[in-house]
Amino acid sequence: MPTINQLVRKGRASETTKSKSPALQDCPQRRGVCTRVYTTTPKKPNSALRKVAKVRLTNGFEVISYIGGEGHNLQEHSVVLIRGGRVKDLPGVRYHMVRGSLDTQGVKDRRQARSKYGAKRAKAAK
């Protein structure tokens, strides 16, 4: 326990928090190029084939990014936009694709939560 005098002289060192998405370097999104698009399986107890892509960012980082929504049009050399946000049951996946921007198309026939999947509003049936 420091004395009052020691605190006056030195003060307390503030703890620095580690970034959860270091490759973004404090930017909201980053652009990158897909180097590999593939599926992977989640941790126990879940079971699925999750769509992910390895992406080389403009700042030189190479990260794994999750492709949300049903169906996608991505392949190698697609230019994509990456945002932060991990996938809890996929170890090492700390980023998400932004659907509906650059080469990534929005989810087709999406009715709810459209803004999260880059889907335009459906035309009203008459």
Curated annotation (Swiss-Prot):
3-methylthioaspartic acid PTM positions: D89
NCBIfam families listed in its UniProt record: rpsL_bact
Pfam short name (any one): Ribosom_S12_S23
Known function: With S4 and S5 plays an important role in translational accuracy.
Subunit field text: Part of the 30S ribosomal subunit. Contacts proteins S8 and S17. May interact with IF1 in the 30S initiation complex.
GO molecular function, one term: structural constituent of ribosome
Keyword Transmembrane helix: no
Residues forming coiled coils: none
Cellular component terms per the entry's GO annotation: small ribosomal subunit
Keywords, in A-Z order: Methylation, Ribonucleoprotein, Ribosomal protein, RNA-binding, rRNA-binding, tRNA-binding
Name recorded for this polypeptide: Small ribosomal subunit protein uS12
GO BP term (any one): translation
Biased segments, Basic residues type: 113-126
Region spans: Disordered: 1-26, 102-126
PROSITE patterns cross-referenced by the UniProt entry: RIBOSOMAL_S12
